Amino acid sequence: MNTKQYNTKTYVLTALFAALIFLVTAYVLHIPTPATGGYIHLGDAVLYLAASILPTPLAVAAGGIGEAMSDAMTGSVVYAIPTFLIKSAMVLCFASAGKKIITKRNIAAAIFAGVICVGGYYLTESILYHSFVSPLVEIPANLIQAGSSAVIYILAGNALDRANLKNRISLTEMRG
């Protein structure tokens, strides 16, 4: 029976993606939204890349940890656990199998992940604010974040596909 085992390079790449997701979310183009204390960022674009490159369980770990750490480190601690859950669910939309990052399925996944993001934070804020009305003010900012992250993901993914990235790295080894 063949079992899939991740090599050291896969774990290192997972840690690098977690760190990159954290940095891009917390510090690169970090735009606060005063209405709710949240912020707009492009970390989801890196999350989508991780989800398209890494094996799913490791992409879930990298995305959830990186995004939750950014909330914890930038003063949005109350969102850290919901962020871990929401971002982990977003990763599950993507497929890392195949030789390309940008596929029709992954483009659709970016859109669906955006819906999960907007809906997840609406539900989170509804619980935190004890209201289904007040979180409506955050939806436009979440839509901007989801849309801009999808565009950046597609542009970066196409560039990495042209560089033949997925064929240059081997993230698993087969053991019998």
Question: What function would you assign to each model-found segment?
Answer:
Residues M1-G176:
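Loop-helix junctions at membrane interfaces
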